Amino acid sequence: KKWRRLLDASVGGNLTVGIYICKDNRWFRYPPFSIQVIKDKIDPYLVYRRIAPGYRMWNRMGIYQRCLEDFTEETFLDNKQTNNNCMNCHSFCMQSPDRMLFHQRALHAGTYILTDGDIEKLDTKTERTISALVYPAWHPSGRYVAFSTNDTKQDFHLSDANRVEVFDNRSDVVVYDVEKHEIVTAPHLSSEENMETFPAFSSDGRRLYFCSAPACRMPESYRKIRYNLQSIAFDPEKRSFGQTIDTLYNANEEGRSAKLPRVSPDGRFLMYTVSDYGNFSIWHKDADLRLLDMLTGKTDSLLQVNSNDVESYHSWSSNSRWFVFSSRRDDGLYTRPYICYLGANGVPGKPFLLPQKETDYYERSLFSFNIPEFIRGKIKVDTYKLIDISKYGEAVRLK
């Protein structure tokens, strides 16, 4: 409460912090530093998966929600409750805690959609798709979810700065109709000539962004493959797509590979990740964030945000003034969530690591933080009901 009062009294100004230590009965003073207090509030919760930074095997993992107004962390679902299976790709509709989805793999496999307390289990593999549905992105209306379908493989380097290569042999993009349990797509999104992945809707729901690269033989061409950032019109009333593809990032011209597009809720900015090649940037030390101003068409390299190590996954706050991203800047191994302010003019502040109550928390932790997502409130779910449906519920098959 004292901290909250101090912040409220300092909105629009700065807090000056002085540090003193007593060593050998003598007091020492460090140079003071300032903290700028912004009037734009941050969403109160952050959701992430915590998992050891392994490659093929896992044991413990879970999805957790952390209150950013204090240090309270609560379990959404821990895999010790579901026979130590894999769970991933949690996603929210417009930062709403009442409409979300996530996948479970291996045991109790399926996609789980939670809507206002209702839980639905889906079997998303169809004869027309490469795989079960993978990387998700909600339509702002909540009626649709865009997904990629991927034939993903993994290889290891004998000697390379990047330990692992994750790549697709094939991939497509589809749109799932939540109400009708149907999948729709278009030739530009599911072609044999290209590999499409990482979909994201515009804030008005009228455009679908995605990444695409010419199909090639993998893994032989893993260092040559580079993804363009593209978009196509989408009509939510007719469930139809446009005929023209717009290219926002041309990989051949730029010489790098784009992935993970995310549009700010106000529609002003599009953030994405670039690396020298490929589409799985979490293992690429050269991966950085980029920010496209949709109003001016200018791209910011975000030099004050990026580091010499991995910057990869990112997501927006509901007011478009904050973003959170995954980074391995601390030790090159563990992925941790960094939070950054973005002014209305597109100028970012200084990123800071998600605060913890114990100052040595990250030094002692043996877990990485995956897929950090802001939400506007606490997820309210009957965990026992979710586990029961996970283990014994019959999955709805898609059409």
Where are these regions (language model features)?
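Sequence signature of WD/YWTD-type beta-propeller architectures
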Residues: K1-K399
